[in-house]
A protein has these predicted regions:
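N-terminal helix-turn-helix DNA-binding module of bacterial transcription factors
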Residues: 1-64, 341
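Alpha-helical recognition/docking segments in bacterial nutrient-uptake
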Residues: 1-8, 62-178, 182, 242-248
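Short beta-strand segments enriched in small/hydrophobic residues
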Residues: 15, 20-22, 59-75, 125, ...
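Helix C-cap/helix->beta junction micro-motif
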Residues: 48, 93, 144-148, 217, ...
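Hinge/beta->alpha junction and helix N-cap segments in small-molecule ligand-binding domains
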Residues: 72-81, 99-108, 130, 165-175, ...
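Short acidic capping loops at alpha-helix termini that bridge into adjacent secondary structure
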Residues: 186-187, 221-224, 273-280
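Flexible loop/turn connectors
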Residues: 237-346
Length: 346
């Protein structure tokens, strides 16, 4: 049915026997109106299959009741779980959600932000490819980053008074590495996402936590901390093969869930089993990790999404903009299963 055939608020008012102003108050849930009149209007609206004109409402209220989410990699189940939690929480609060994927590319992120700004969203939730204000072109600082309420999640942008909902990647990588050292491993490698390391601090923080634990134990890590682009299968296989061929590796920490599949393929081709020949810890406790009894780092995806959405909506509905940065740090959990064992050479 075209818009011209849809019932208008005048039609609803006529059917209910009230003024247009009263119908507007009843449908918009504002102002003073008796329960009896409100019920008449709502009944009339239902009978006529009335659909509110959101554009007109937003022009009157100066709010679109829409928030945007710019995510770094929608193919990553970690981000997918966060977005699902954001969407659910936003819907509970009466907000619609627009989703944009930057695919870990800064130029695409800026395009997404410019497009979303043109749609006059009320606020933006952002897992950014930028780590500092200085990296962002001035045009976008002025038209987006200083204009809209913004909350970042998983990743922080230094130099802005934003709320950031994060996890302590350094501390968890340190904990994972200490766990493997405690099992007698002294040939511990990491494999991280090349694309993510280029544009965010996540992989770097995990690598730093890993190195700190090894330094503390007096264990070398030369050449055992690599990154790969999982979308380039042949190159990824080559790098992992080199890692396993030229180093005495007894354990591997896979720093990004997007890499796990390619890593396991290489182990399968080399007829290497875990934990018998190599111990493995992965990031993000997904369903296949549980099925394969893989020791994993469980991330608080739902809580991160809910807190990010709640924080943004509170800012949108606040009378004054946020003046100081706020960091909310959530706990990750090491879930120990059967992919690690005591190193027999210990």
């Amino acid at each position: 049915m075209g818009r011209e055939n849809q019932a208008t608020i005048k039609d609803v008012a006529k059917r209910a026997g009230v003024s247009v102003a009263s119908a507007g108050r009843a449908l918009g849930n504002y102002g003073k109106i008796s329960d009896e009149t409100k019920q008449k209007v709502l009944a009339a609206a239902e009978e006529l299959h009335y659909i509110p004109n959101k554009l007109a409402q937003s022009m009157r209220s100066h709010s679109t009741k829409t928030i945007a989410v710019v995510v770094a990699d929608i193919q990553n189940n970690f981000f997918g779980a966060i977005v699902a939690a954001i969407e659910q929480k936003a819907r509970q609060k009466g907000y619609a959600v627009l989703i944009c994927n930057s695919n870990e590319k800064r130029e695409l992120e800026l395009e997404c932000l410019e497009m979303l700004a043109s749609k006059q969203v009320d606020g933006i939730l952002l897992a950014s490819t930028f780590t500092d204000r200085k990296e962002i072109p001035t045009k976008y600082v002025k038209t987006v980053f200083e204009k809209f309420p913004i909350v970042t999640f998983d990743r922080k942008i230094n130099g802005f008074p934003f709320t950031s909902v994060l996890t302590d990647n350094y501390a968890m990588a340190y904990t994972v590495t200490k766990y493997l050292i405690g099992l007698g491993h002294d040939g511990i490698a990491t494999i991280g996402s090349e694309k993510e390391k280029a544009v965010s601090n996540t992989v770097r923080e995990r690598e730093e936590g890993y190195r700190a634990a090894l330094r503390e134990a007096g264990i070398s890590h030369d050449g055992m901390c690599i990154t790969v682009d999982w979308q380039k299968a042949a190159e990824t296989k080559k790098r992992i093969d080199i890692l396993l061929d030229y180093h005495r590796i007894t354990a591997v920490i896979v720093l990004n869930n997007s890499i796990v599949g390619e890593f396991l393929k290489v182990l399968d081709e080399r007829k290497m089993s875990f934990p018998e020949q190599i111990s493995v810890v992965t990031w993000d406790d997904e369903e296949h990790n549980i099925y394969m009894k893989m020791t994993s780092v469980r991330q608080p995806c739902r809580k991160m999404g809910e807190l990010a959405a709640t924080s943004l909506i509170e800012q949108i509905e606040s009378d004054s903009p946020q003046q100081e940065e706020l960091t909310i740090t959530l706990n990750q959990t090491l879930v120990k299963r059967e992919s690690c064992r005591i190193n027999k050479t210990y």
